[in-house]
């Protein structure tokens, strides 16, 4: 099944742009830049959108302008309008359980406490079977510190690692369309930024 919608999760507004929780949006921003497809606000989809072609496939990019816990509103609206099935969607999000410098593809699964994923699963009719790009941001080591951590900005050393992992993820996304998910996954999952 080809991917038809790539989503980068974020909170809206300048005050959140550089926070760890917006790592998914950084990836979609990079894809849009690499493929010269600037994102434009599209109110009916509650987000910034663009359209790209990868290996002859028509793909939509989306960064919701809703708050993170309402991400499903944007994803649901676009999926419904273009008749996109859950397994044709790739959602990029920040991942506490992976260190900075690592990113991994995954199909399906739970939300792991991630409010953006939780809302998307709900708005897709409780169907969790969409693809994810998990962008590692690390963990503060104490679950009571998670909210402050994801809404905080990473230090320069960590930002560099996250950026390198996102860059590799963008290359692997293009590889996915060229040579398939298995090859893209194999390459991405052996990558670790230094």
UniProtKB/Swiss-Prot annotation:
TRNA binds at residues 16, 67, 69, 115. GO terms for molecular function: peptidyl-tRNA hydrolase activity; tRNA binding. It comes from the Bacteria. It is found in: Cytoplasm. CDD domains: PTH (cd00462). The keyword Ribonucleoprotein does not apply. GO terms for biological process: protein quality control for misfolded or incompletely synthesized proteins; rescue of stalled ribosome. Keywords: Cytoplasm, Hydrolase, RNA-binding, tRNA-binding. The active site is at 21 (proton acceptor). The record marks 11 as: Discriminates between blocked and unblocked aminoacyl-tRNA. The record marks 94 as: Stabilizes the basic form of H active site to accept a proton. Its main location: cytoplasm. It catalyses: an N-acyl-L-alpha-aminoacyl-tRNA + H2O = an N-acyl-L-amino acid + a tRNA + H(+); N-acetylglycyl-tRNA(Gly) + H2O = N-acetylglycine + tRNA(Gly) + H(+). The keyword Hydrolase applies. Its EC number is 3.1.1.29. SUPFAM superfamilies: Peptidyl-tRNA hydrolase-like. Pfam families: Pept_tRNA_hydro. One of its GO terms (cellular component) is cytoplasm. Belongs to the PTH family. Monomer. This is Peptidyl-tRNA hydrolase.
């Amino acid at each position: 099944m080809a991917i038809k919608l790539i989503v980068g999760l974020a909170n809206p507004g300048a005050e959140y742009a550089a926070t760890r929780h917006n790592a998914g949006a950084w990836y979609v921003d990079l894809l849009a830049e690499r493929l010269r497809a600037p994102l434009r606000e599209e109110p009916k989809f509650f987000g910034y959108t663009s359209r790209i072609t990868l290996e002859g496939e028509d793909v939509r990019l989306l960064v919701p302008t809703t708050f993170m816990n309402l991400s499903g509103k944007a994803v649901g609206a676009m999926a419904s309008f273009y008749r996109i099935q859950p397994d044709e969607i790739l959602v990029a999000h920040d991942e506490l359980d992976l260190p900075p410098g690592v990113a991994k593809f995954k199909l399906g699964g739970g939300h792991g406490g991630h409010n953006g994923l939780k809302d998307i699963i709900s708005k897709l009719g409780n169907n969790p079977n969409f693809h994810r790009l998990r962008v590692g941001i690390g963990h503060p080591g104490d679950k009571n510190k998670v909210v402050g951590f994801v809404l905080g900005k990473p230090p320069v050393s960590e930002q560099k690692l996250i950026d390198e992992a996102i860059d590799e993820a963008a290359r692997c996304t293009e590889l996915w369309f060229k040579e398939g998910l298995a090859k893209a996954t194999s390459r991405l999952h052996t990558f670790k930024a230094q």
